[in-house]
Every structure is written in C-alpha cells, then in structure tokens.
Amino acid sequence: MPRRYGDLWDRVVAFDNIERSYRAAAKNKRYRNDVLKYAANLEENIINTQNLLVWHQWKPGPMRSFWVNDPKPRFIQAPPFSDRVVHHALVSVVEPVFERKMIEDSYACRKGKGVHAARRRAQEYIRMAKREWGKVYVLKADISKYFPSINHDVLFRMFTRTIKDRNVLWLARQIIYKSGYKNRGIPVGALTSQLEANIYLTLFDHWIKDELGIRYYVRYMDDFMILSRSKSILRELLHEIEAYLVVELSLALNPKTTIVPARGVDFCGYRIWPTHTLPRKRNLKKVRRRFRAMSNMYASGRVDLNYVHARVASFLGYMKYCDGYRTTKSVLDELVLKRKN
C-alpha cells in the first residue's frame, strides 16, 4: 500500500501561506485589474479566501478563455485571480508530497528540471545507449489531446492514493470536478493543471521504469522517448503502452508516434545526436518567415527597434542551447533593418 499523507490542511489555509500565494500569483501581473482589486484590500481578501476554504464554501469562478499561437494554436482557460491564489496555496503544500513519488526522468513543470534538463538527459541516454549497443532506435511518442483527455475519476483516485487529509481532498475535488469540464479535461492555464498532468502519468512512469525495467526513458509532460537496440522490441513495447494507456488512464497515443534510428532525435524543440544538438527544422522555417515579415514591418514603420530586439533575443535564447553558430548567422543575415524613405 503506498504511503498516504495527512495533516496538510492547516498549512494550506494558513494566513502566511495564502499571503505568499497571493504574491506568487501576482508576480509579473501586479498592474492587471483583477490583481489590483485583490491587492486594494489585501488583508481582508486573504481572510475572506481563508474563511471560504476553512468552511468549505469556496468554489471555482468562471474561466477567461482565449487562444495563443506560440508555438502552435492552443486554447487557454485562465482562472480568475482569486482562484489562482487558492491554486498556489494548495500546490505549495501538496506538490512536495507528490514530488517524492515522481521518477527522476520526468522533467516538465518541476523545480530544478525543465525543457533543457530533459534535452540534456535525452542526449546523455542516446550517448550511453550507443556505447552499449552500437545501433540505437527510438520510440518517440506523445499523448493525443492530453489535457482535454484527463479523466476526472482517475485523477481524483490518484490524489487519494497519496493524500488522506479529507479537507485537502475536498479542495482537490472542487478544482477537478467543478472547473467547467464534464467527466474529463483540465484547463490549460491553471497552475493546478500542471501538477495534475504530472501526477496523471506518474503511475505510467513507474510502470515503464519499474515493472518493464526500461532504463532509457525520458518524459517531458506528455512527450516521451524510449531507446532500444531493436525496432522489433520497440514495436512490441508500443502495443503494450497503447493497451496500458487505454485501460489504466483512458488515454491514446498520437497517431504520429514513430520508431526510427536514434539520429537527430526530435525532442523538446531540438534535434539531438550523441555528439551535438541542432535546432528543429520547422522552428527555423518559422523564424525565417517571421524575420522576413519583421523586416518589412520595420521598413514601413509598423514596429520599432524594441520590438525587433525582443524577437531577436528570443531567437538567440533558443539557439544558445544547441550547436548552431552558422545557422544563427544565416538566419540573422535575413533580418534587414532599413526604413523606407
């Protein structure tokens, strides 16, 4: 029986914790209207939030919905600011508890990890596997429509496997079941959803690593890669994975799942070899297209140098993690900044 944790609620609803949660939720958003409104009567609002939680009267408010297009179109549902304070208060207490049960090679939305740590681990594993086997193959997969597919009942059961504090479970139930989705789906844009998405695949991680004994496995949110010396081994494994995801988690793999030689593995936004890393080709095409458009916009006076500098800095930030000096120079050469007379 897995260990379950109690005596967490007092920490969640403590005034100091809610105050810290307000500051975390307000970071880089201090001048938004909803943040200013909460801050105008800060102590009163913290106490009100505290009372709503203590008396089990809190419930999620309506989400703000919008689309973003970076790197691809995504539908975002952002909770109101007061809800984000509650989310921070919960996550700050329960996340360390769930962290103890997560595997080392899960990298998304975790302190001390992240996309570049995942990329480095993937390269390290490719290098190790090549030394061990010579020829290496990779199973590269991701979950189809992951956030909209997360089953509420399965997710809540995962909370009960780790948490026994009834008050914390009440709050988790409110967030999971009353955020505007029926039976399945969690909002992209909520802090709690990042934790829930990691929790949801933790049992899968342990099944891969502990039960199947797979060493070379790396996951970043719903993207994962597995290395093997044989295509046939990976094909058999793929069938097992598909069955496990359907039966245990009500999930399906993206049809674009591939099994290919581990040369230029496309993972976490880069193409990874044992000895070097290059930018993803489609990312470069997109940047070149944007830079050409930006040259025209600058020439006609529609954007200024500050706008250009911000986009160039973003591109250089992406490129600094790979071996792409000549590529960087080639892309920047396409950016021509000249005003029309």
Predicted regions mapped to residue ranges:
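Short Gly/Ser/Thr- and Asp/Glu-enriched loop/turn motifs at secondary-structure junctions
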Residues: G61-M63, V218-D222, K256
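A common structural junction motif
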Residues: I163, E242-L251
